Amino acid sequence: MFKKVENKANFPKIEEKILKFWNDNKIFEKSMEQREGCEEFTFYDGPPFATGLPHFGHFVPNTIKDIIPRYQTMKGKYVKRNFGWDTHGLPVEYEVEKKLGISGKYEIENYGIENFNKECKKIVLRYTEEWKNIILRLGRWVDFEKGYKTMDISFMESVWWVFKNLYNKGLIYESYYVLPYSPKLATPLSNFEVNLGEYKEVNDPSLTIKFKIKDKNEYLLAWTTTPWTLPSNLGIAVGKEIEYSKIFDKKKEEILILGSKKINSYFDDENAYTIIEKFKGSQLQGIEYEPIFNYFLEQKDKGAFKVHTADYITTDDGTGIVHIAPFGEEDYRVLKKHTNVDIIDPLDAECKFTNRVKDFKGLFVKDADKKIIENLKLRNFLFKRENYLHRYPFCYRTNYPIIYRPISSWFVNVEKIKTQLLEVNEKINWMPAHLKKGRFGKWLENAKDWAISRNRFWGNPIPIWICSKTGKKICVGSRKELEELSGQKIEDLHKDKIDKITWPSKDGGTFIRTSEVLDCWFESGAMPYASNHYPFANESNFKNIFPADFIAEGLDQTRGWFYTLTILGTSLFENTAFKNVIVNGLVLSSDGRKMSKSFKNYTDPMEVINTFGADALRLYLIMSPVVKADDLKYSDNGVRDVLKNIIIPIWNAYSFFTTYAIIDKFKPTKNLSLVKSNNLDKWIISELESLKKILNKEIDKYNLTKSIESLLEFIDKLNNWYIRRSRRRFWKSENDKDKNDAYETLYYAIKTLMILLAPFIPFITEEIYQNLKTDEDKQSIHLNDYPKANENFIDKTIEEKINLARKITSMARSLRSLHNIKIRMPISTIYVVTKNQNEQNMLIEMQEIILDEINVKEMKIKSNEEELITYKAKANFKELGKKLGKDMKTVSIEISKLKNEDIIKIINGISHEIKVDNAKYYLSLNDIILERDEKDNLKVINEESITIGIDSLITQELYLEGLTREFVRQIQNLRKEKNFDVSDRINLYIENNATLEEILNKFEKYIKTETLALNIILNKSKLEKKINLDNDIFTIIGIEKC
């Protein structure tokens, strides 16, 4: 019936075999086919870029995205799993620029946009085969053949439909705004793209500049950390309520104005200056000053070169006075509020100065700092120069500094729908839950309008055509519409093709498309519609696939994909795009740094899989804090530990069962009975049925952490209690009902556990199932229904009894370990103290098991722990400090003097009076901290409501029995070393030894039974291994098969 199972398994090889089995038998396809026509469970797969290989950061969401669909399929749902590829955008273009050796907008245009886009199309799916191989090797079932690509014309057309819907609702507008801009990519970025990048500590020059007040010999001292913005200065800002001082600088003989609190930052000696007057910033409002550069003098008539009040000014840094240029969001807002100045941006696409700033023409802004400082110093405008250490954003694609500048861009009016966004967020089940009100909720509360246009080439073109004469705009929402407007056949929607599509307007002009392409995050957010070519196809079925039942990605997507899905879902349908989401944290290297090839601080993921197996890696990731959106410091040793402590014990349980089932020719019946008389059988079956309830509940709630914890607890109970305590039932030679019940129970437990584990570790579960399944069973474990609990076999009473016994056992083992008393050394007595009468009754029933487990001769059950210990007390300062005040010290001394009987009264609820002068205080149990002193030879430990004590006195008789148990253990180890089968009978060879002679006189029968030794023989020539029974007691043994 069952195949023989090797004790030592090569799990990576087993997994390769299972992959072949799945592939040869089309198991994934069959799992889908058998659910066709069933209720649909919708899962959206966030599209990755295929311009790089998957890493550990991809493995976490991909494991989660395998577990939930497998589980839902086993629950009877039809779950489409179509992979997607993000094929447009900056990541692709940047890779092509590196490949071609070109950089920036101008060089791309010279190379030719059509040629450039052809290269993008070639490179975009460079690693798709590697992705397929790695994702499938991880054990994830996903359909690559029916996957979508954002560059497909059907996908792009649906994105146009989404855009036009937002446009028609008044949610799309074009405007100048200060935006984060990537000089290397020559395009603006969205706020959440900035957050995807890194903020680095940088040392920038910090300047204090003198601005001369018009018609006066007085200077405003203004501060900046961006010298390159000074040529574009158009104003100065002060704080309305901040106090400023006009001082006379005795050394330079100049009158200066700065924040009163900042004078000491600029003058060490109070005698170096004289304060002329003090006033609020509001008195500076409207004062004119002389520009320090003459590049934009024409703006003077429009309100430039004046002082304005602003609410963001502080005296934390600088002078309390700030220079204003249209390169900061707040600066831009102040200029718009107080002036009519034009939008000034003397920078080209690569953030180099244009001819408008002729003295610094051609210099990249950051490189211009030095020359600008020299210029100001030469003309006596520089008052002070320092360095300023601060965090500055760098582009997430180029690792180059981001520049903030005024840009004409297309926006989604997010602020207009902010209330709806927050309402929609309330419908989403976030896992972990804190993200709803926390990171994601806060991001929505502070959401700004989304800049969706990119001045790039490889992307989905913004479908707006503008009349060259009147400026009239037409937004196009489909190919058909564009064909009707232009009279041309549309075969491709990319920029190099679509920009050629123009048509005459009625006003004598020409409709020409606006030059920008869409932010690729807009496409990702449109994925629910575009991947189904909605509404041009799948319109009737759309209500079944939107919103998604489930999605999963990393924490960074709270400001990426989760955000854009939510914006577009809310904008289109006032609904969430997804109902449930599991968010994982970052996977870092073991040193806490970002994983990097250049740092060489992580092992190649495929090497990990080929060493430990994908199941071990999956389990390691899912068990870790990363599933709760926390960071994980990845370690190969962590995966090794999972293999050792979980995967191998599962295999050992399976190996144990098959070994004895083969010997006894056990054959499972079709209708296996769960009605058992043995309490161990009843208990493990009850625990298994309870586990089913927990898993169905917790996975339905997307709580993978609780699910895994419950599974691991059961594996521990099965291996370390049920199997260990049932061994002799399998060993005995007669095939009675008890032995058959043990076989049936263990068979049912292992097989059912494998089905429960299948979504989590699909390989080992399949391997074990293939050997355990009967002719009536499904072809693959993954074609089974997910097990539901049989309430008739849940017995909470027996669970409580055995779990109490396990708790007492665990406490006793801890106590032994604490006092260096080996488990094989018998102890005369254990005392168990509990006031709970029900627990006392259960302990009486479980007494025999407990004594056997912890190797104790007698158990005494007590109601009061004072029979084992005497008490001392210390003051609980945390509690008493609030009540006693100055009397605390005196009362503390009195508490330390309390007698044992006084403390017992307090424990029993009788308050104890302490007098201090005329005051009386009454102590309760919360007011003291108990200390326990053990009586006589007792060693005591307390855990919650239970206290146990063991008698540590070891008599000679007990000591001899302990040596016997150690002797048996050493023989068993030798059996393993020699690869003897568990059922092999042996001859045991010993030397002439006084201690052994004493042991054999008392325990020969026990030794033979435990080691399957038929004969114990004195024979020096057969001795092979020296063993240590205890400290200096050595002997030599040998064994051979009979």
From Swiss-Prot:
Assembly information from the UniProt record: Monomer.
UniProt keyword annotation of Coiled coil present: no
Catalytic activity: tRNA(Ile) + L-isoleucine + ATP = L-isoleucyl-tRNA(Ile) + AMP + diphosphate
Keyword Ribonucleoprotein: no
A single Gene Ontology CC term: cytoplasm
GO molecular function: aminoacyl-tRNA deacylase activity; ATP binding; isoleucine-tRNA ligase activity; tRNA binding; zinc ion binding
UniProt subcellular location: Cytoplasm
Family that this chain belongs to: Belongs to the class-I aminoacyl-tRNA synthetase family. IleS type 2 subfamily.
Record function comment: Catalyzes the attachment of isoleucine to tRNA(Ile). As IleRS can inadvertently accommodate and process structurally similar amino acids such as valine, to avoid such errors it has two additional distinct tRNA(Ile)-dependent editing activities. One activity is designated as 'pretransfer' editing and involves the hydrolysis of activated Val-AMP. The other activity is designated 'posttransfer' editing and involves deacylation of mischarged Val-tRNA(Ile).
Top-level lineage group: Bacteria
EC number: 6.1.1.5
Xref: Gene3D superfamilies: HUPs, Isoleucyl-tRNA Synthetase, Domain 1
EC primary class: ligase
Motif 'HIGH' region boundaries: 48-58
Keywords: Aminoacyl-tRNA synthetase, ATP-binding, Cytoplasm, Ligase, Metal-binding, Nucleotide-binding, Protein biosynthesis, Zinc
Organism: Borrelia garinii subsp. bavariensis (strain ATCC BAA-2496 / DSM 23469 / PBi)
Protein name: Isoleucine--tRNA ligase
Motif ('KMSKS' region): 594-598
Cofactor dependency: Zn(2+)
Domain notes: IleRS has two distinct active sites: one for aminoacylation and one for editing. The misactivated valine is translocated from the active site to the editing site, which sterically excludes the correctly activated isoleucine. The single editing site contains two valyl binding pockets, one specific for each substrate (Val-AMP or Val-tRNA(Ile)).
Binding site for ATP: 597
GO biological process: isoleucyl-tRNA aminoacylation
